[in-house]
Design a protein with these regions (language model features):
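Membrane-embedded alpha-helical bundles that constitute the cytochrome b-like, heme-associated redox core
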Residues: 1-186
C-alpha cells in the first residue's frame, strides 16, 4: 500500500506540473489515490493486527507522553506504528483524502472537469479548487516531515525503518508478528 500511494502521489504531482496534455493521467491517478485511501481506511478496521487503527491510535495523554522519546536518541520500539507515527498516518490519509475528493469537483476551465464539477455551484467548485491547490502545499510539508522522521529514526535512533518499509518485515518477538491469513484460502 505505502509504495503504491507514494508513487501515485508522485505521479499526480508530476502530471499536474506537466501541463494540460497530462490532465487525463492526473485524473486517473487521482481516482487511483482515492481507491487506495478508501482501501486503507477499510483495512484500518478489518486488516491485520498492526494495520488496524485500534492498534496504533492512542489517547492524547499517551501521545504527548511518547513525544519525550521522539526527540531523544533513546529508542522506544514498536512493531507497528508508534504513537506519533500512528497519528501521522491518520493525518496523512486525511489530507490525501481531502486532495482526492476536492479534485472530483474542480475544472481546469478549458478541457477537463472533475466528474462532479457540474453538480455543484461555481462557488463550491471554486472553493474545492482553492482547497485542492492549498492542500497540496500542506501535503508537501507532511511528506517532508515524514521523510525527516524516517531519516531520524533510521540514523539518529538506529531503527531499521527503511528496511522494514521496503521488505515489509521488522525484527521483534514472534508473538507480535502477523499470523498468515487463512481467510482468503476459504
Amino acid at each position: 500500500f505505502h509504495w503504491s500511494l507514494a508513487l501515485t502521489f508522485l505521479g499526480s504531482w508530476i502530471t499536474a506540473e506537466a501541463g494540460l496534455e497530462w490532465a487525463s493521467t492526473h485524473m486517473f491517478l487521482g481516482y487511483m489515490m482515492l481507491s487506495l485511501l478508501l482501501f486503507r481506511i477499510l483495512w484500518g478496521f478489518v486488516g491485520t493486527r498492526h494495520a488496524k487503527f485500534s492498534s496504533f491510535l492512542v489517547s492524547p495523554r499517551v501521545f504527548f507522553s511518547s513525544l519525550q522519546y521522539l526527540f531523544s536518541r533513546r529508542s522506544e520500539d514498536h512493531i507497528g506504528h508508534g504513537p506519533s507515527g500512528g497519528w501521522a498516518t491518520v493525518l496523512i490519509i486525511s489530507v490525501l483524502l481531502v486532495q482526492a475528493i476536492s479534485g472530483l469537483f474542480i475544472s481546469d476551465d478549458i478541457f477537463n472537469d472533475g466528474p462532479y464539477h457540474r453538480s455543484v455551484s461555481d462557488g463550491v467548485a471554486s472553493f474545492m479548487a482553492n482547497m485542492h491547490h492549498l492542500n497540496f502545499n500542506l501535503i508537501l510539508c507532511l511528506v517532508a516531515l515524514h521523510l525527516s522522521a524516517i531519516g531520524w529514526f533510521q540514523f539518529g535512533k538506529n531503527q531499521a525503518l527503511t528496511k522494514a518499509m521496503l521488505l515489509g518485515k521488522k525484527k521483534g518477538p514472534a508473538v507480535l508478528g502477523i499470523k498468515s491469513s487463512q481467510t482468503l484460502k476459504a
